[in-house]
Design a protein with these regions (language model features):
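Active-site lining segments that contact anionic ligands and/or coordinate catalytic metals
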Residues: 7-10, 40-42, 86-87, 105
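Short hydrophobic segments within beta-strands
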Residues: 15-16, 45, 92
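Short active-site neighborhood of thiol/selenol oxidoreductases, capturing the structured segment around
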Residues: 2-24, 30
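Structural microenvironment flanking redox-active thiols in thiol-disulfide oxidoreductases
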Residues: 24-60, 73-78
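A cross-kingdom marker for long, charged
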Residues: 7-10, 63, 76
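Short hydrophobic/aromatic-enriched beta-strand-loop microsegments
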Residues: 64-69
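Thiol/disulfide oxidoreductase modules built on the thioredoxin-like
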Residues: 72-113
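Short, hinge-like loop/turn segments at secondary-structure boundaries
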Residues: 60-62, 85
Length: 115
């Protein structure tokens, strides 16, 4: 799915979960922060045990591309990216190569402002 996205200067891959209190605070703030930019496309990969809460919550972020990873921590994609905590952020260039992996939300905002 990531390979099919086109047309952005940068991409932001966000691993999150509807059961994560940090995610529930940061993800809406991130959405507001990026709302008016066209140069960054967001891929929100939600790691869940089931799709019920995710189906409802993804509607709050209509401009993002959404993907569901059932199995939460055991999900193949989460394991591929070595996700051990949520939220986890990966900033990608236009060729979808990882250029930054900030640990803190404040660091992410600084990186995104500089793109």
């Amino acid at each position: 799915q990531l390979s099919s996205l086109q047309g952005a200067e940068n991409y932001l891959l966000v691993f999150w979960s509807t059961g994560c209190s940090h995610c529930l605070r940061e993800i809406p703030e991130l959405y507001k922060f990026l709302k008016d930019t066209q140069k960054i496309k967001v891929i929100a990969f939600s790691m869940e045990e089931n799709a019920v809460r995710w189906e409802q919550m993804k509607k709050d972020f209509p401009h993002w591309h959404h993907a569901l990873g059932l199995g939460k921590w055991e999900n193949k994609t989460a394991k591929t990216y070595s996700i051990y905590s949520t939220p986890s952020y990966f900033v990608l260039d236009k060729n979808k190569k990882i250029i930054e992996k900030p640990a803190l939300f404040e660091d992410l905002k600084i990186i995104l402002e500089q793109l």
